[in-house]
């Protein structure tokens, strides 16, 4: 049996109830927590990796600096923190930060690095992971970019639809269709 991991994308307060709150976010957090709990109950060392948008306060993606987004997930603010319900599953060595450079917009978890400079891809490979279950926010942006990079890099990828939040329902549904066409498994009900 190939080793499986869960990747949690941007389940951060600004995307849940803050400046960029997404549709279905609270429900997605609950579904993600449930999926993680089911995975770790039999295997306490089950890998759960977290991707975090982690911006400096003057990030170029913010409207006030010429970008398209309101300020969000600023370093050392509540908005950039992982939801409390998921914090018990966080291991510092399995957190990957993206968007840390002022002039770089990064959507994919593959662009993030851990505190020790390790990439998501190298970490998954070091753990012997072959299959990845993705949950997170937002389906059309960071979840999509991360899933596509996982697929390109040879991982079997699935998403839990109930554990995804989104900016727009039409974009969410279109992305789920794209996932299925590309070979990503969309789990409709847990």
PLM region spans:
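Active-site acidic carboxylates
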Residues: 1-100, 155-156, 167-189
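A short glycine-rich beta-strand->turn/loop micro-motif centered on a GG-aromatic cluster
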Residues: 133-136, 155-169
């Amino acid at each position: 049996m190939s080793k499986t991991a869960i990747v949690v994308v941007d389940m951060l307060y600004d995307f849940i109830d803050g400046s960029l709150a997404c549709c279905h976010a609270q429900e997605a957090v609950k579904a993600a927590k449930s999926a993680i709990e089911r995975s770790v109950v039999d295997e306490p060392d089950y890998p759960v990796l977290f991707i975090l948008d982690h911006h400096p306060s003057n990030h170029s993606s913010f409207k006030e600096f010429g970008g398209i987004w309101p300020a969000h997930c600023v370093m050392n603010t509540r908005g950039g923190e992982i939801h409390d319900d998921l914090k018990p599953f966080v291991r510092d060595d399995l957190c990957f930060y993206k968007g840390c450079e002022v002039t770089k917009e990064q959507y994919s978890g593959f662009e993030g690095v851990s505190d020790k400079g390790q990439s998501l891809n190298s970490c998954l490979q070091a753990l012997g992971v072959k299959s990845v279950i993705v949950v997170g926010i937002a389906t059309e942006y960071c979840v999509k970019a991360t899933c596509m990079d996982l697929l390109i890099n040879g991982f079997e990828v699935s998403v839990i639809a109930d554990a995804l939040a989104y900016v727009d329902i039409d974009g969410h549904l279109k992305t789920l269709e794209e996932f299925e066409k590309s070979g990503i498994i969309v789990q409709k009900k847990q």
